[in-house]
Amino acid sequence: MTLAETPNYKNSSNPLLSLNYESALESLGDDYYDEVAAAEFPQHILRWRNDALLPRLGLDPQVVKDEDFITAFGQFQGRKPLLALRYHGYQFGEYNGQLGDGRGFLYGQVRATDGELYDFGTKGSGRTPYSRGGDGMLTLKGGVREVLAAEALHHLGVRTSRCLTMIETGLPLWRGDEPSPTRSSVMIRMSSSHIRFGTFERLHYFQRPDLTKKLLDHVIEQYYRHLSSEQDKYVLFYAELVKRVAELVAQWMAAGFCHAVLNTDNMSITGESFDYGPYAFIPTYNPSFIAAYFDYYGRYCYGNQPSICKLNLQMLQEPLKAILDKDEMEAALERFDEYYQAEYSSLMLKRLGFVELSYPQAAELLNLTVEFLKDSQVGYHQFFYEMARTFSSKWRDEPGFVMNNSDIVPVPGASGIFDDWCILYHKILNDFDSDRIDVIAQTLAVHNPKTALLRPVIESTWKAIAQEDNWQPFYELIQAIQSRK
């Protein structure tokens, strides 16, 4: 059944079903996906609707009812075909050819008001041919965590998928890493693309360069449209993907975010952050911080993220080399570190209050900041928030005024580094007039919100839901994240 034949598709009174759904990926043919059926749930309770995304889809939040979300994204009425995408991937360094959408599917693709194509992908919508013995479901806690991660990262300026909605579905689930039975949910993830590095790796595994080229042409036409008419569009695509991924991981690092599971099947071909599992925001600066309890050797620890993303880009060259020149891809990848460092330095300087500094000043300040954070083990997010909260023009007068009203207390042995940092910050401020001091205060406030999505915050929010069915802390936390308070 094609989209045009979908029952009630164009004439539906449900605004979410009346969107201008496109069949860009479906038109590639069934070498890339399987048609699947959605699970039927005993209950549908709308727990989250992301009204901030609706105007981008040309919808008025006041017009779209809660029941519309449930009908479209909980009961999946009026939408066919539903497509489970096929892909493989390197998981913790080992190739896995048994992957694919195991608990979700591509619900549809929508051209937004900005002209960009967005994918609606489900999570927790039931079994598919790739469920590998799993139930295809999503725990309610898993849904809550993904909503929070996506909103937090988006409002920190990280390029990320967003959660359009989350619906509790009334099924008891059994999990080894949660008290069970636990509650269930289904969610809709709005992302720039459902296609992963692993989508190409699967085609290479089956030795289908024809399908690889067809998919790559599709990716460029839909997500790198500015390159579609270029003679060297393939190598230009790879070069831009390198830049996007390098900048993305720099955004994670500056935000203190650890993705936890950077397998190639969790890497988006558009260079967007998505697929949030056991992620965590670091409590203190520790390059060895591990977010996933099953990452026994720390492969995906916080400090390894840049090198792992670079490695994944290098492994992507294998399926692409049937179309792209290997040497040209290597030349593009060599710029990864340059892109990463430029983005990371820019973001960290903004967290320190500066839109720009001379290279010697910037390098010295960043190096000393990281050294202090590492040795002192003060709260990573607390340090930057305290800078924003206590910043004063008096910091320019004497080094002793810098951070003197903050709650930052270095551990014994780190006070000397902290003194050096205060002296350097004071010295840099001496070069700024009063107008530029005001800009520093504004920059600090914008880039260092009070609310940090640390694990105790998430667990406290979940405890209220699990024990009392109290959702107020969840909504208040999202409000704080969105308002950057």
UniProtKB/Swiss-Prot annotation:
Mg(2+) binds at N266, D275. Keywords: ATP-binding, Magnesium, Manganese, Metal-binding, Nucleotide-binding, Nucleotidyltransferase, Transferase. Its EC number is 2.7.7.-, 2.7.7.108. It is an enzyme of class 2 (transferase). It catalyses: L-seryl-[protein] + ATP = 3-O-(5'-adenylyl)-L-seryl-[protein] + diphosphate; L-threonyl-[protein] + ATP = 3-O-(5'-adenylyl)-L-threonyl-[protein] + diphosphate; L-tyrosyl-[protein] + ATP = O-(5'-adenylyl)-L-tyrosyl-[protein] + diphosphate; L-histidyl-[protein] + UTP = N(tele)-(5'-uridylyl)-L-histidyl-[protein] + diphosphate. ATP binds at G100, G102, R103, K123, D135, G136, R189, R196, D275. Pfam families: SelO. One of its GO terms (molecular function) is ATP binding. Its cofactor is Mg(2+); Mn(2+). Nucleotidyltransferase involved in the post-translational modification of proteins. It can catalyze the addition of adenosine monophosphate (AMP) or uridine monophosphate (UMP) to a protein, resulting in modifications known as AMPylation and UMPylation. Belongs to the SELO family. This is Protein nucleotidyltransferase YdiU. It comes from Nostoc punctiforme (strain ATCC 29133 / PCC 73102).
